[in-house]
Amino acid sequence: MLEELYRRGHRNLHLLLFGNQEKNVEFPFPSTNAGFITDMNKLAGLYSAADIFLNPTLQDVLSNVALESMACKTPSVTFRTGGVPEVVLDGRTGLVAPQGDLDQMAGHCERLIRDGKLLLALAEEGRQHAEQTFSYPVIAARHAALYEETLREYRREG
């Protein structure tokens, strides 16, 4: 996918990598590997420093990394797999390609590279979606409501 972006003429990209990386992987662009990050403030700074979060996951129940990037106003480009479509709303909070479609993923990246207005719109709506749907207070309130409903049902049934 990165080779495809390079082939399409995008030469001024810089990759910011974090997490566990395979050794001796060569990229067509300069890269910085920040390694495995445990400090949440540093991680938020890295997400915020990026323009696009590229998440080529093939399996994901709920994409926490996409949520983290969206919370930092960095839209995701990812595959449609597992719970990802609940997190990344295609065309609203990020761009989603069919699973394994590297050509479309490259096209999505290219679109965001060329369209700064779209990039900013996705970043803003992504932040709002992360806060309004997946923040700790929202999730806690949903769980509390579920427990209360379960208790009401239990009491009714006796």
Predicted regions and their residues:
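Conserved acidic donor-binding segment of nucleotide-sugar-dependent glycosyltransferases
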Residues: 90-91, 95-102, 111-116
